[in-house]
Design a protein with these regions (language model features):
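Charge-rich, low-complexity intrinsically disordered regions
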Residues: 1-272
Length: 272
């Protein structure tokens, strides 16, 4: 109701725990964001921030509002400083659901990123995109495969200092094209393939060997086009003699082009 004592009681007993702002002069989230020493003192005990401002902060000239990004947030986990791949403010803005799960506490947010976010290849800094890093460096893919944490830690420990690019690569470089000793490069382009069939990533992930395996073992039977250079439907329709040889065995058309067709000058796809 309207009773001022009851409203004040509600604010103190419940509203502060929900970090409600009850004055234009004081925003508890801003106060928490600006002062790292207060975060260490009060953590998730929101009442502490209000009480500190009332007792000491205002008189000392501390800012009660105006801070929209956390200052001095924690970046060290397990003895390793993740500052080159982790920005608290960037992270919670990109993944607001993290705050819903663990709250604003900067140590808890960092813990979540390291323990769960990295495995989901979440980007926590404008400076580092794990997908880009994986795409650009084939040697790192061989070393870390689907262990996403490896890419972050490599950049933290060696990559940044070594001048490696943390962002900017939108297509995989140096991807695998050999399966069972046959090089499918003339009918297979990793980047073309995942762009055309994004559901493949949902099934096998970004690993270039796994994507190639999927293409050869399942995609060819579905006559999927994995390169601008080769359209299996066009190749089949343009070469009646091959239809007699391979019929509905779609892999035959791909393999024919790889082994003989391209070298013989046969056209693999309709010219654009």
């Amino acid at each position: 109701g309207y009773d001022d004592q009851k409203v004040l009681n509600y604010f103190v007993e419940q509203g502060m725990a929900q970090h409600q702002q009850a004055s234009a002069e004081f925003d508890p989230v801003s106060y928490r964001f600006e002062y790292a020493d207060l975060r260490k003192a009060y953590g998730d005990t929101w009442a502490g921030y209000y009480n500190h401002y009332v007792r000491w902060g205002k008189a000392a000239g501390l800012h009660g509002t105006g801070c929209t990004e956390m200052k001095g947030y924690v970046t060290v986990y397990g003895g390793l400083d993740y500052a080159s791949v982790y920005d608290y403010n960037y992270y919670i803005e990109k993944y607001p659901e993290v705050v819903n799960k663990v709250g604003y506490d900067d140590q808890k947010v960092l813990n979540y990123f390291v323990e769960q976010g990295m495995a989901q290849h979440q980007q926590a800094s404008a400076q580092f995109d794990p997908v880009s890093y994986r795409f650009e460096y084939a040697d790192l893919r061989k070393a870390y495969g689907d262990t996403w944490a490896g890419y972050y830690r490599h950049y933290v420990r060696w990559g940044e200092a070594g001048g490696l690019h943390g962002t900017g690569c939108t297509e995989m470089k140096g991807y695998v094209t050999v399966y069972g000793s046959l090089d499918y490069a003339s009918v297979y382009d990793y980047n073309y393939y995942i762009a055309k069939y994004p559901e493949v990533l949902n099934k096998v992930g970004y690993d270039d060997q796994k994507v190639l395996n999927y293409f050869v073992e399942q995609g060819m039977a579905q006559h999927q086009q994995a390169s601008a250079e080769f359209d299996p439907v066009y190749y089949r329709n343009s070469n009646p003699s091959l239809q007699n040889a391979y019929g509905d065995t779609w892999a035959g058309y791909y393999n024919h082009y790889v082994r003989w067709g391209k070298a013989a000058g046969l056209q693999g796809a309709e010219q654009q």
